[in-house]
């Protein structure tokens, strides 16, 4: 998992509530078992025209001034719906490192923490300020200090200390388990052989 400490990036405002996992990555694109290749179909039904499948120039991800943004600012209950891990994979594959929402579905939130997508909860008034930032401007997400900063604004957020440790050190569950490799090996040597 890639380490996340401080992200300095533009934001993509998508201030809609109840964006479900089928809107994030529709079911017809879930045929791959790898974690890559999903970004091109992120928000597919909004991003492309239904009749021609051409890019919808009115959708924010298709606007050139937002191409490099790594932070998505969105509404309440983000990632609701089915439990597909592919939704997080699609966001990561597109280039997002952080999502700032009012709330998340529990399963989406856990999938995010396990796949290196920092999911931050902020109240609507704070997100409204962040969503109004011009495309060329950048904000700072400072995980060690648990702050989102932009000019005179500073928004504090909460995160489970274990997840914070995992993000800052780039540790997934397997890497954390491997920290105990010597203890695991010692335990395995003590197990009687039943052959």
Curated annotation (Swiss-Prot):
GO cellular component, one term: 3-isopropylmalate dehydratase complex
Reaction(s) catalysed (UniProt annotation): (2R,3S)-3-isopropylmalate = (2S)-2-isopropylmalate
GO BP terms, alphabetized: L-leucine biosynthetic process
Pathway: Amino-acid biosynthesis; L-leucine biosynthesis; L-leucine from 3-methyl-2-oxobutanoate: step 2/4
Keyword field: Amino-acid biosynthesis, Branched-chain amino acid biosynthesis, Leucine biosynthesis, Lyase
EC number: 4.2.1.33
Single GO MF descriptor: 3-isopropylmalate dehydratase activity
Keyword Membrane: no
Annotated signal peptide: none
Entry annotated with the keyword Lyase: yes
Record-linked NCBIfam families: leuD, PRK01641.1
Family: Belongs to the LeuD family. LeuD type 1 subfamily.
UniProt function note: Catalyzes the isomerization between 2-isopropylmalate and 3-isopropylmalate, via the formation of 2-isopropylmaleate.
Subunit details: Heterodimer of LeuC and LeuD.
Protein's name in the database: 3-isopropylmalate dehydratase small subunit
The organism of origin for this protein: Oenococcus oeni (strain ATCC BAA-331 / PSU-1)
Gene name as annotated: leuD
């Amino acid at each position: 998992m890639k380490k996340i400490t401080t992200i300095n990036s533009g934001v993509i405002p998508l201030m809609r509530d109840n964006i479900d996992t089928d809107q994030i990555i529709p079911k017809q694109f879930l045929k791959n078992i790898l974690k890559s290749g999903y970004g091109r179909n992120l928000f597919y039904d909004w991003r492309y025209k239904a009749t021609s499948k051409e890019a919808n120039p009115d959708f924010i991800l298709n606007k050139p001034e937002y191409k490099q943004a790594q932070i998505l600012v969105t509404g309440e209950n983000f990632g609701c719906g089915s439990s597909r891990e592919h939704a997080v994979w699609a966001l990561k594959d597109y280039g997002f490192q952080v999502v700032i929402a009012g709330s998340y579905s529990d399963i989406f939130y856990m999938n995010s923490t396990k796949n290196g997508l920092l999911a931050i909860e902020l109240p609507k008034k704070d997100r409204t300020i962040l969503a109004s930032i011009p495309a060329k401007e950048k904000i700072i997400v400072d995980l060690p200090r648990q702050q989102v900063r932009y000019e005179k604004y500073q928004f504090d957020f909460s995160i489970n200390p274990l997840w914070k440790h995992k993000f800052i050190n780039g540790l997934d569950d397997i890497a954390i388990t491997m920290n105990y490799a010597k203890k695991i090996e010692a335990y395995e040597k003590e197990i009687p052989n039943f052959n």
